[in-house]
Amino acid sequence: MSFREIKAGEKAKHPEDHGKKQSSSWINGMENSTQASTSVEKRNHHWRSYKLIIDPALKKGQHKLYRYDGQHFSMPNSGIAPVDCVRDPRIGRIWTKTKELELSVPKFKIDEFYVGPVPPKQVTFAKLNDNIRENFLTDMCKKYGEVEEVEILYNPKNKKHLGIAKVIFATVKGAREAVQHLHNTSVMGNIIHVELDTKGETRMRFYELLVNGLYTPQTLPVGTEQDASPTVNETLQLTDSLKRLKDSNLSSVGSSVTPNSSTPFSHDTAYSSCRQDTPNSFSQFTPQSQGTPHTPRLGTPFSQDSTYSSRQTTPVYHFGQDSGYKHRRHETKFTDAYNRRPGGHHYVHNSPGVFRGTEHQFSTFKSHQQEPVQFSHTPPLSHSSSSSYKSAFSPYQAPAVFPQSEEQPFAQTSREAEYRRPAPPPAEMVVESSAATSADFAPVKEKPEEPPPLPDSNSAPEPSAPSFSQTPERSETPGTPTMESEMQHNSLDSRIEMLLKEQRTKLPFLNEHDSDNEVRMEGSPISSSSSQLSPIPMYGSNSQPGYRAQTPSSRPSSTGLEDISPTPLPDSDDDEPIPGTASLNQNSRGTSEASMTPIDQLNRASKVETLEVKEMVPGDQTPTSEKMDESQHSSGEDMEISDDEMNSAPITSAECAKTIVVNSSVSNAAVMAPSIPPLPPPPGFPPLPPPPPPPPQPAFPMPPPLPPPPPPTHPAVTVPPPPLPAPPGVPPPHILPPLPPFHPGMFPVMQVDMISVLGNHWGGMPMSFQMQTQMLSRMMQAQNTYQYPPFMGGRMQFVNLPPYRPFSMGAARGRGQQWPPLPKFDPSVPPPGYEPKKEDPHKATVDGVLLVIVKELKAIMKRDLNRKMVEVVAFRAFDDWWDKKERLAKASLTPVKSGGELEEKPKPKDRITSCLLENWNKGEGLGYEGIGLGIGLRGAIRLPSFKVKRKEPPEAASAGDQKRIRPSTSVDDEDEESERDRDASDTTSDLSKKDAEAVGLRRRPARPLELDSEGEEGDETSGKEEESSSEKEEEQEEEGGLVKAAPGKEEEEDEDDEEDEDDDEDEEDEEDYEETGVETSDKEEEQDSEEEDAASPSSSKAEVESSDESEDSSEFESSSDSDEDDDEEEEEEEDEEEEEEEEVAEDQDREAMVAETEHEPASHELPDDKRETILELYPVDYMDATGLGLSEPALVEKDEGMEEVKAEESECDQVPEESIAAETLKQLVMERDQETKLALSPICRPVEEPEPIVMLEPEVQECPKPESQDEAGTVCLSTPVAVFGEARPSKSSFFSKSDDSCLETHVKTKLPSAVEEEDRLPRTPGREVVVHSETDILLLPAHKVPSSTVPLPSTPGKEESVVPPEKFPEQLMVTKTSIEEEIPRTPGRDILAKSSHPLGKSQSTDTVPATPGSDAPLTGSSLTLSSPQVPGSPFSYPSQSPGINSGIPRTPGRDFNFTPTFPEAGATIPCLLSGKKQSEDDLDEKPFKEPLGASLTISMNSVPSPIPFASPTQADFRTDMGLPPNEPIPIAALPCIPGDGRMPIEECKAEVKSVLLSPEAPVGASILPPPPPHSVLPKRRPGRPRRSPPSVLSLDMYSGKTIEPPPVPVALVESAMSKELLSAHPDAFYGLKDPEAVTLDFRNDSFHEKIAAETVAEKLPFKELENQWNEDFKEEEAHAKPKRQWRRQKKSPEHLPVIPSPEYSPPQPQFRPRSEFEEMTILYDIWNGGIDEEDIKFMCITYDRLLQQDNGMDWLNDTLWVFHPSTSFSTPKKKKRDDGMREHVTGCARSEGYYKIDKKDKLKYLNNSRAFAEEPPADTQGMSIPAQPHASTRAGSERRSEQRRLLSSFTGSCDSDLLKFNQLKFRKKKLKFCKSHIHDWGLFAMEPIAADEMVIEYVGQNIRQVIADMREKRYEDEGIGSSYMFRVDHDTIIDATKCGNFARFINHSCNPNCYAKVITVESQKKIVIYSKQHINVNEEITYDYKFPIEDVKIPCLCGSENCRGTLN
């Protein structure tokens, strides 16, 4: 009965009686009821049941109450409701509360019955360590997303861990991220293989392989195929994207598409739906297993239903939801779907009236394909189709780009109708449409809007066309929205990347199509996916009806290719068969998709791609559009997979295809292009060798016979089969000869966007940009290897041209098709009737072979690269170690050695990087590079020449740049090595050459403090400041002496990067350098060797210099190498000393610095080659004008420079100013020269002498920046250089790039004693600055100073190529050599010099070695005058890499690295700031060690241009300074810039004035004349800042020394800068680096400088910048003394004017221009490390510049600047050393109050390096490091007292073991476990262990024997082979198998060094291992296991002399 719950408050039926006691008498349960129904009644009633409701026994006072039959009660008023009112007896309130119930969302089991694309959530792990268990794996994966299931597979037979695991993530993203982050990572010592394994197939394959004993867990073949996981990933991604598309499309389409395995999205897209609804154009193929669109083949993960692959609506088809025309090429599927679809969107081709019956369409299509008429239909459809499709894809459809007459009746065959897709508009249109689609559909991409009306299929014609344009993505990769998005995403990135890499520059097909393709490549399955994912079967393959659908690869192809199947156009093609397309269509569609082979599918994909493009064109009015849309569509989901796939996974087939999309595009474009150009050839074109598919027609009709589609599953390797013979008349697309065949899949990689494909993965292997560029160039070169390639190229070029309707090979125009629209069908595509496309019978074989070969090649390349990388790393590590040791040893020795050593140290590094990249540069191993993406790429983009001769492997860069070795660095590692060797020899000769100079250079050793590159290592290497300092100094000297070298190094690194872009130029430059021979060698070697060895020359130079410098500099700097290290300590003592010394040292340093500047430039003296380069960069005239040629004395240089400056100024905005400045500079230079001549010995020179000016020069340089580099150089020369001799005019130059060279030259020119004096005089940053500053500056007329007679060499030295080598060599050599080489770089000076140099070098911080003085390398990146202290000041502008400065706080004064980050101009500023005593670290850190002078010679104008100063506007400054408006502001003045915050503005003014007034000031004040506007720097890769004139100080260039880009004329700079920079000056003042604030003229240095400033960071990876900064910091540390001086200056701003801050600013270092490769690498680096705002600004400026310049970079025209947030976030520095002193947050130490400096930070500058020993190893893995404070942290007394206390607590009888045990606990031994030679893991001592000491306790679980036996058996079953059970006694065993400590790793030895002992501690027996003998560090700890003798012997592997042979 049903009870009704009595609700609360509800009364009982008889409330009145309720609760009353029933008075009736009870009888036997019968009551005398008083109820209405009397008891009698009741009694009489025959009760069937009764129940005792109330029992008095239970309830007191109650009467029995019965209830009868649930209704009647024994008592009339029982108060209880009868049963009919039954109520729930439970308390009602308990139900008032609602419980939240979480119902688990049912998850579909993904098994063989799973329908639809399987979400890629399942990840397969392979090669796992057998110790990894589920928990560990779960924890490992949790970080990437929720883990649903974790399963580790064990061998069922022996329960052994198979190293395979399955992890199912809750989200696809989690799975992808896990794969991305865990794949190929080391876990528990094993490099694990992680891949998306959607259905666990790979895992099961692994499982079978392992269980069958074919492989062991560690030998499991998880090669490229496994890497194919990318394919899987891609497929999965595609699936996701397809799903997304499907979701969006289906929803929009409204068609109930069964999730096609093929193309999830295909259903969604109008295209998809259309396809599904509409019989496929390939209807005839529908019969393929494909099934209808609704029932896509399950084969393909996403159902790559692309018509090609499975019925899955190919992404291509997805293009337009309305793209009925583009239904899957699988006719059946489409037809079925079409028929099924309510008014299925027949392809738009089908006239709305024409319902393509499945059969009809199929037949029609077949016939159509065969019948050109049908195809012809397509073209006509093209436009109307577009509309039709549009309706389907309305959102995406853009009005048909090319209105094509509506495809004639879609009534044409269903196929026809499908093909009726509007004929591809002319390629151009298509491309445009594509582009438009790309842009327009980008949104659609993700979800191509389903055709608004499903009617699309029927009325598809209308939407069709729009659909194409609207949903090209759908068309292209309907199923791979991800891909599409990816494409868009990648498209943009890829395009940018390509542009950057010049990969895409001009793939003609890249125009619009390129974008689309790129998009597609990246995101669109059509191109990319189709090609890659579903290898588009060769035409022939396509022709085979079932070929494609059948193949799994088809599925991958379908991923992106399916819709792009070779016959994508067939939709359009259906209507308008294209000769090639027709065949393609026929083949691809005719060929049952299902039956198609992967190749066929690939081809088909290709065809689809092409066709689709065409179809898209008709439908989209842009095949590309459609394609693009599809791509986009596809990219939506595809992107998820594809994007990740492409990005993280090796390029898979799909990826390749995508990438190939470019080719596809190309193919499409090419196909279209053929269509466009009269494509009579298509009919007549000889088929590609492989007859199967004709080469992709212009790109539409016929997917070029794709190379055999790579194994469908291996997206990464889509090896196009040998190009199939193009259908007659169908030339293969030009892009890659194989392209036509491969077209969609381009050689899976080649054709693909090199960037996307190669970038993402070369054959599944991530490729560096360099590799890609190399490959691209190679491919481009080999591009024409095929007969068709040229045509292809043309096609590609004409991608945008409306493709001619492909000629049907004898096929009549499709009915209703307007052949004209057919253009989308490339004429090269055979007509529908054309059967030559039938894939080559051997195509599959060929494709398979190619795939295998490609895989093998990829594997080989991967292996080789890995090996090379490993070797590089190992060698580098060794080199680093060696160098470190050498440095340590040398630290104590003369800095010379250290410098040499340091130089050497970088060398290996560079070599390593170079080697890594070398092959790529060489294109070695790039089997497909030869394919050539197309002339367009290389031609338009001028791909970097990978034959770049890295004359200067970044040796100097090795020191500085090596740390930030560019990908390009390894471009020509071998070359670099050879070059290095050559350079070394050259360097050697240079050394000999420079030995005289070296004498002057000797001082450099004092500069080890400035161990820019090495300094980093030094710091890193050793906590010893001394070491660091000496190293730094050495390095700095190397870098200083090799300032050019280091910058060169850096530059070389940059050049390596640049070498990518400027490879050719750089090659030339480098070659020039090489030609120059020794000089080049000097510079290059200095750079290279600095990288290599810090260049032998630099080494010797540095050594000599070091010697001199040490001697000289040690006088003042008190062995600045070591003293600087001790500076911190000495600082106090030395402070006083230094103050005195400062004056002396400053004078001397100034002299030395001048000398050094000169000397350094000398040492960095541009080799003739470099000079030539410089000359090349700067016309001879210009050089002459600027004094670059500087054959004549500095005066001539000055005059020339002045003239040049004037000319340039006039050319630039402020000719007058420049002229004035130039004249002034000339005068100043002349005066200065005279003065200099008078004071030949800078050392002895009074403060007034030029040398001090040199210090000032840096200031002046910085201030004025180079108004005229010539002037600047002249000034520099006139100053110390002048003193040294005429050569000295190069001083500015030396300040710049050629500081060392100048010094060298100077040294040569100058009296040895003078040089030596200079060199010997330690350059105290402050002192020299002060002395020179006041006297020199004062001597120099303010007017003159601004003019800077001697143009400071921009650091072109590093940039070598900046100055035309011709002029540059002699003068440069002389002046530069003497100055640069002769004068060791004092940190301060070097800062200036370096400042300039860093900027000058490559105008990229990377390139620019961090000048010790300037915290931030003067790379244009950081305008920062490296004065962390002054937040607002440009000087304080933090280095680009925060990490660089981060570390030890920098004192504003010291750390004030007045290395303006502005390239040239900025460089000078650092000099200015150097007055503030650029941090010694800065100097040290500065990769370039250049005299301050160079830096100083930065015309204020020029300075602001690159990087706004943190100083008043020039105008204000000039006004304050009393300088003429046009006159560059001397750096000296600048140092006082308020922004600097060190010197009051007044002081600054005074200082500037003094600098200006100082006759010698010109050197410092000399403003580098900007190179004449007409002077054209060597063309750099577009977008690349000109490396040549990086430094603001182009003085050398003008003087012939520095090869830094001449700064923009001062006037120009001033005008521009004052307008922009100065307008931004406030920002500049506040340290804001507003690249945009400065208008850079590419022709002007300022532009370069700015670019450099902005690009420096760009070029230099942030870490590199950081490295430089760190170097600077290290150098600062190294130059503790100078720091103190600076501090003093800082302390007494009043003195600052006296001690020009610029002193510390070394002239901008000159750097060898980066090679194209380097440039490319840098460019490409944004793909790896992102791009920061500065670089973005720089790029934007560069872009604008390039656009204005119009250097013939076609890609520029194809490039549109779109704002994008910065993607680069500086990553923590990798090297501890990089973490220099932490920059003070406020920029001022005093304002910070007290804060603790970490020991690590202190170690950087503390003398004692013992702290390092105290430091725990960086890698503590396997190390048992007690968690107690280091011994050093605990007072010995404390320890001893503890020991005594313990001893006293023991009784004499107590065994000492306990004491020892406690002692062990008290101080555990440092142990580590690592691989043992005895057996597996072993335990090793990390510290000496005395005999009989307790080593470690054997820890484990105490278990009984029984348990031990059980466990032993279980462990055996589990496959745990080793036994970790240690018997304590007869009944106790310690089991350390599962838990324990390192003792478990102790191996057995028959001759052990330890023994086990059981001791009792607190009644517990413990096993303790005691040492039997003294154990040395790293000695393995062993003991005798003493196993009982057994019959089964365990072999002993101890290998000891008395080994027993067995353990038992």
Swiss-Prot record:
Residues 111-199 form the RRM domain. GO terms for cellular component: chromosome; cytoplasm; nuclear speck; nucleus; Set1C/COMPASS complex. Residues 1577-1587, 1681-1690 have a biased composition (Basic residues). It is found in: Nucleus speckle; Chromosome. InterPro entries: COMPASS_Set1_N-SET, Nucleotide-bd_a/b_plait_sf, Post-SET_dom, RBD_domain_sf, RRM_dom, Set1-like, Set1B_RRM, SET_dom. Keywords: Activator, Chromatin regulator, Chromosome, Methyltransferase, Nucleus, RNA-binding, S-adenosyl-L-methionine, Transcription, Transcription regulation, Transferase. Residues 1992-2008 form the Post-SET domain. Residues 251-264, 524-537, 1345-1356, 1418-1427 have a biased composition (Low complexity). CDD domains: RRM_Set1B (cd12549), SET_SETD1 (cd19169). The keyword Kinase does not apply. It catalyses: L-lysyl(4)-[histone H3] + 3 S-adenosyl-L-methionine = N(6),N(6),N(6)-trimethyl-L-lysyl(4)-[histone H3] + 3 S-adenosyl-L-homocysteine + 3 H(+). S-adenosyl-L-methionine binds at residue 1985. Residues 1-42, 249-390, 402-652, 682-725, 950-1172, 1309-1328, 1345-1461, 1563-1600, 1674-1712, 1814-1842 are annotated as: Disordered. One of its GO terms (molecular function) is histone H3K4 trimethyltransferase activity. Residues 1-20, 492-521, 606-617, 626-636, 979-997, 1021-1031, 1150-1172, 1378-1392 have a biased composition (Basic and acidic residues). Residues 637-646, 1011-1020, 1050-1094, 1105-1149 have a biased composition (Acidic residues). GO terms for biological process: methylation. Its EC number is 2.1.1.354. Signal peptide: none annotated. Its main location: nucleus. Belongs to the class V-like SAM-binding methyltransferase superfamily. Component of the SET1B/COMPASS complex. Histone methyltransferase that specifically methylates 'Lys-4' of histone H3, when part of the SET1 histone methyltransferase (HMT) complex, but not if the neighboring 'Lys-9' residue is already methylated. H3 'Lys-4' methylation represents a specific tag for epigenetic transcriptional activation. This is Histone-lysine N-methyltransferase SETD1B.
